[in-house]
């Protein structure tokens, strides 16, 4: 699973930061979280193929998070896509997509299924064989949802034990791995628990959207085993009043939620244009947070400031900057 930051700015794009968008590559698919203006152009500089996008998650309907959708969908259509796309979002997302599809004399010949979320509680919105996704209502000036993508891990097969019990290479091994019992030629029944090892830890990413800090959100992430939190940090902590007035988060807010969530890594994004030529404020504050809080001074807990086109590999816990 790999995260690619297509846009890490806030309301106004800058020479260093595009409008909000994050792509996650997993098992041949691309999951797109928000689609600010210019998102499809940012993809040109990455290994994301728009044709591999099957699910788009829109946190809320502010322009800096959705104004890239029209161009992206039209370009996908121009390239001959026929596979359907799912779009998830808050109330009014259906009307928004309908209006988008009226723009530009498009050639869209694929089905777009819009899933309008209207829940005040966390809800599972996708449950497939390989992954699941959740929506979590957060606290912003308009309806807004965070999203969580979690890998499903199957138990590992203890091949040596299976061979010792007389299971032959072939369909029986797959059946056991899928959780089914099998009957051998000699009549002996082998149960999954006889040959399966516990699954390895699964990878899980949360994307906060725009929000004030919510401790319950952190606790929910902890309960499902989230490993990486992408959290908005529009302001440095000296601008706490600005954050409260605009219903956003500060650096310290985001880091605190990450610690409550017990994630390995917090990645800060949605950074105000006021810091475009003074991003050192973020690095200095992170250094002070770690220095002054023993619980953050942990080699297993990382705080990263996102940059446009930066990549983060969850398996190797590696950051790649371009």
Curated annotation (Swiss-Prot):
It holds the Pfam family Lactamase_B. It comes from the Archaea. Keywords: Endonuclease, Hydrolase, Metal-binding, Nuclease, tRNA processing, Zinc. It is an enzyme of class 3 (hydrolase). Its EC number is 3.1.26.11. Disulfide bonds: none annotated. SMART domains: Lactamase_B (SM00849). It catalyses: Endonucleolytic cleavage of RNA, removing extra 3' nucleotides from tRNA precursor, generating 3' termini of tRNAs. A 3'-hydroxy group is left at the tRNA terminus and a 5'-phosphoryl group is left at the trailer molecule. Zn(2+) 2 binds at residues 64-65, 210, 270. Its cofactor is Zn(2+). One of its GO terms (molecular function) is 3'-tRNA processing endoribonuclease activity. Zn(2+) 1 binds at residues 60, 62, 140, 210. InterPro entries: Metallo-B-lactamas (IPR001279), RibonucZ/Hydroxyglut_hydro (IPR036866), RNase_Z/BN (IPR013471). The active site is at 64 (proton acceptor). SUPFAM superfamilies: Metallo-hydrolase/oxidoreductase (SSF56281). Binds 2 Zn(2+) ions. NCBIfam families: PRK00055.1-3, RNase_Z. PANTHER family: ZINC PHOSPHODIESTERASE ELAC PROTEIN 1. Belongs to the RNase Z family. HAMAP family: RNase_Z_BN (MF_01818). Zinc phosphodiesterase, which displays some tRNA 3'-processing endonuclease activity. Probably involved in tRNA maturation, by removing a 3'-trailer from precursor tRNA. Homodimer. This is Ribonuclease Z. It comes from Methanococcus aeolicus (strain ATCC BAA-1280 / DSM 17508 / OCM 812 / Nankai-3).
């Amino acid at each position: 699973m790999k995260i690619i930051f297509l846009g890490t700015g806030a309301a106004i794009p800058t020479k260093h930061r595009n409008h909000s968008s994050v792509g996650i590559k997993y098992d041949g698919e691309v999951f797109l979280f928000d689609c600010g203006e210019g998102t499809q152009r940012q993809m040109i500089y990455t290994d994301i193929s728009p044709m591999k996008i099957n699910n788009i998650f829109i946190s809320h309907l502010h322009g800096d998070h959705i104004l890239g959708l029209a161009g992206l969908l039209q370009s996908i259509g121009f390239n001959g896509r026929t596979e359907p796309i799912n779009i998830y979002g808050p109330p009014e997302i259906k009307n928004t997509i309908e209006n988008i599809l009226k723009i530009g004399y498009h050639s869209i010949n694929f089905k777009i299924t819009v899933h309008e979320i209207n829940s005040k509680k966390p809800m599972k919105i996708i449950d497939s064989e390989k992954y699941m996704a959740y929506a979590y209502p957060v606290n912003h000036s308009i309806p807004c949802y965070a999203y969580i993508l979690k890998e499903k891990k199957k138990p590992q097969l203890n091949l040596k034990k299976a061979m010792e019990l007389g299971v032959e290479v072939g369909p029986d091994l797959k059946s056991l791995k899928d959780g089914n019992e099998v009957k051998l030629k000699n009549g002996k029944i082998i149960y999954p628990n006889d040959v399966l090892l516990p699954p390895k830890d699964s990878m899980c990413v949360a994307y906060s959207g725009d929000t004030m800090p919510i401790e319950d959100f952190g606790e929910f992430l902890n309960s499902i085993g989230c490993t990486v939190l992408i959290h908005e940090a529009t302001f440095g902590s000296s601008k706490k009043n600005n954050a409260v007035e605009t219903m956003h988060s500060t650096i310290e807010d985001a880091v605190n939620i990450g610690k409550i969530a017990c994630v390995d890594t917090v990645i800060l994004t949605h950074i105000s244009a006021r810091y475009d030529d003074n991003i050192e404020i973020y690095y200095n504050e992170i250094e002070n947070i770690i220095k002054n809080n023993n619980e953050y001074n942990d080699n297993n807990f990382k705080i990263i400031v996102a940059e446009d086109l930066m990549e983060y590999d969850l398996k190797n816990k590696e950051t790649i900057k371009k």
